[in-house]
């Protein structure tokens, strides 16, 4: 049986020792939240604002042996989290940010939450990845 992208992502997060994720579920990341809710190793913490979630993820990296992980929707979710992401980056604190994406196989542009996140994040992250195939999920998270 093939694994979904969400199952692969949660598997990889468990393998690297993530204990908590912080964020807000939305149409672009519902499946991964469904899988996080099944995990016995990871507790998804729902927040009321993405920036607060970013600061919480920062705190986990600063105070535990786990990497702080932010789980957000694209565009508005990512832009709301920028202050917390930038703070972690400037202090050299590791943070893993997983953002949902928009479909790219329809030929339609200007979809809900379509924005060039990689360009925006370039100055305040060490790396940014665009996963296009299921086979890229686990190796990318391990990196």
Which residues does each predicted region cover?
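N-terminal alpha/beta PP-like core and its mobile active-site loop of ThDP/TPP-dependent enzymes
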Residues: 1-143
């Amino acid at each position: 049986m093939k694994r979904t992208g969400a199952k692969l992502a949660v598997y990889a997060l468990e393998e690297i020792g993530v204990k908590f994720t912080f964020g807000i579920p939305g149409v672009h990341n519902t499946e991964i939240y469904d899988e996080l809710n099944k995990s016995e190793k990871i507790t998804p913490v729902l927040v009321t604002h993405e920036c607060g979630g970013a600061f919480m993820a920062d705190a986990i990296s600063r105070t535990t042996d786990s990497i702080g992980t932010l789980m957000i929707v694209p565009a508005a979710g990512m832009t709301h989290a920028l202050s917390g992401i930038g703070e972690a980056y400037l202090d050299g604190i590791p943070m893993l940010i997983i953002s949902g994406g928009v479909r790219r196989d329809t030929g339609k542009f200007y979809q809900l939450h379509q924005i060039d996140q990689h360009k925006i994040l370039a100055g305040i992250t060490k790396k940014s990845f665009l996963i296009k195939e299921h086979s890229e999920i686990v190796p990318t998270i391990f990196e």
